[in-house]
Regions:
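Solvent-exposed edge beta-strands and adjacent loop segments
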Residues: 2-68, 107-115
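Short beta-strand and beta-hairpin "edge-sheet" elements
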Residues: 42-47, 91-132
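Oligomerization/assembly interface segments of phage tail-like spikes and tubes
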Residues: 54-77, 117-130
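Surface-exposed, low-hydrophobicity beta-strand/loop segments enriched in small/polar/acidic residues
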Residues: 74-98
Length: 133
């Protein structure tokens, strides 16, 4: 018996907006609605190809993303916003302009930032019941 696993890869534009769950009013499949006065952390990866792999679990099929992404160096006051894995929603766009939302309020992405000398590292881990692509 073979276990076939297909990995989907999609190129995302070089702007990602990261919201902590506590900043959000609502999240739909195509829109992130922040609470009044809340703004996301915006990061700029050089190039971003997200890899999504299906994972069959006892509870059903999940789509997993586990990546560390180099991003432009953040100001120190922004880099410390995610020092440990933090439940978050990530919003970006693919190259056709369609919004890509990673994480849901029920299954948020776990996000943290690792400071480095030249570039910071954005660590993302998420399992979703529906593919964001």
């Amino acid at each position: 018996m073979f276990n076939l696993q297909y990995i989907t890869m999609i190129e995302i534009c070089n702007i990602l907006r990261i919201y902590k769950l506590s900043q959000l009013k609502a999240v739909t499949e195509s829109e992130v609605i922040p609470k009044s006065g809340e703004t996301p952390l915006t990061v700029y990866p050089d190039q971003l190809d997200l890899e999504l792999s299906p994972d069959q679990q006892d509870g059903g099929l999940l789509y997993k993303i586990e990546q560390t992404i180099p991003v432009s160096k953040l100001p120190e006051d922004e880099a410390v916003l995610f020092p440990i894995p933090t439940p978050s929603i990530i919003e970006g766009e693919n190259t056709t302009g369609k919004k890509v939302i990673i994480g849901t309020p029920e299954c948020p992405a776990s996000v943290y930032i690792i400071p480095h000398l030249q570039k910071d590292q954005l660590s993302v881990a998420c399992s979703m019941q529906k593919s964001p692509f």
